[in-house]
């Protein structure tokens, strides 16, 4: 298992997701013993070493870059149309000695809806509730219903660097805004980074480097966007409509849960401060003393809100939030909030001597 070490000559274990790509100078891989000999037990199985940029001598240089892009889901399954689906189910039931899953009258409605001679996706069950599943006649592509065709994102980067022969500095910042692919409910990710680094040669044989890095990650999604949602999505019947004939979200269609069933917000901050002292008592012999501290804080809010289905008259009534998995009764609500803080300290003292023969 490889670890990610981020830094410029001095290193601290970190997540690559917290690094602004524009701040990367180089990426290298050290394997097993080679990495352990330098970074100890934290790198016993190898490391991916990401070296970040440093300031350069010369006039102050200001650089900006920005980009906009779009994402799309790939490899999305093609869904069988509802009439073919119903035929397959009836045939499978007959093969095991059972009766029709879809009655002849329902088959007629399914075909009529596909041909455009019937506008309603379902009918009254006789008790003022819309028919579902094997008694409905919709033609829903559920992947098309829940996945958007494109998701925009934007990224902006700004850096300032410069210095003299003895002192160099670099200040950089970035902003990433990435929208999710869900059509119902809001899912998005935002990342902010701010970095600073200064290196100064105190004497000919003593150099000091100080760097600081702050990264914030904001993540929002519907609380319902969990494993059960994706489990259900691939198993939904195309005959079950996403909306009833009145235009309301259909019971057990999960559109209501995604849009109004609550949301999850997460905010995570990473603060990293690093100090490196390099002594060179004689030419090509360097003694390195590194110290760093990374503080990680996270706050998370997760809520479940009541969700509704609608009867034939258009009146709302409570329905289960989690599609019958039994975790929440119809009409129930819940809020969970938690926060935590972690301090991670590292020190590294090593020496190297370079001689070319």
Please describe what each predicted stretch is:
Residues 49-51, 63, 157-161, 197, ...:
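Outer-membrane beta-barrel architecture
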Residues 13, 33-38, 55-58, 70-73, ...:
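Short beta-strands and strand-coil junctions in structured, solvent-facing domains, enriched
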Residues 13-31:
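Short acidic/polar hinge/loop motifs at secondary-structure boundaries
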Residues 27-28, 48-50:
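Non-catalytic regulatory/gating segments with a bias toward low-complexity or hydrophobic composition
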Residues 21, 57, 153, 164-165, ...:
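Outer-membrane beta-barrel channels and translocator barrels
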Residues 1-12:
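Single conserved hydrophobic/aromatic residue that forms the stacking wall/gate
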Residues 57-138, 176, 180-272, 288-290, ...:
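Surface-exposed loop/interface segments of Gram-negative outer-membrane beta-barrel transport/assembly proteins
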